[in-house]
């Protein structure tokens, strides 16, 4: 039985965001790097998982720790601090699941580089966007604030020629923040992703999201979309957020907000399937929440892991309330 009886509605949605992000990462790890044809030849249709995820969840939970340690005001330096103090999570047993340029950036921190310098030379990745869900929870109901904080945090690993990855992080964070608004729908949270991105500097990512969502809505079905997307929107680096973020948002649309459908569709999408699933599952979890119906779906996760994610959700919700109270108090003081 899921440990949800005592949770508030907000806490249930935050828990679902984290739990389904983990499921998306774990299920997608089976098909990561594969194209759809190879997935079908090897597995048929993927709809099961084992394990607790890869680098996506590790980096996400390090960011959550940074937010908790700073009462919700984490910046790029604070995330870097968690990379250093918990470096065994990056360089440990799952180090082979990290993209090389991120391991290189983390190694720079170990060698006393300033955090603001480690992004130099990094390749395009989804490291910040795949990890950004806690920012959406802490800024729940305020997509603009979520986008601003996500942009700052993403600058740890994405600057200059790959700064568009900041836009990807802003899009995912604002989408999750918008999912906690009363009356939120699939369409409203997807619109939040577009609205979060600067229309001038972020024009490339913004346009890609708009175009890919239009393709999803006009496609006959998921497989037709998948074929068209992989013909026109794939990048040389499969973890490039210009590919993964629009794809994840399209998975949200095809799943109509159902987190299980989102992670299954993501796993069968191929390419950077675990990262796409982590983002899509997190968004849909935040939108839909969690109930007893999810027990069987989440059963492959170890009980200890589920409890850890539950406590993490509770901590992030508490930080949200604390931060919101502090912001209200600050804005109420004026001469």
Regions found by a protein language model. Name each.
Residues 1-335:
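Structured, active/binding-site neighborhoods that engage oxygen-rich ligands
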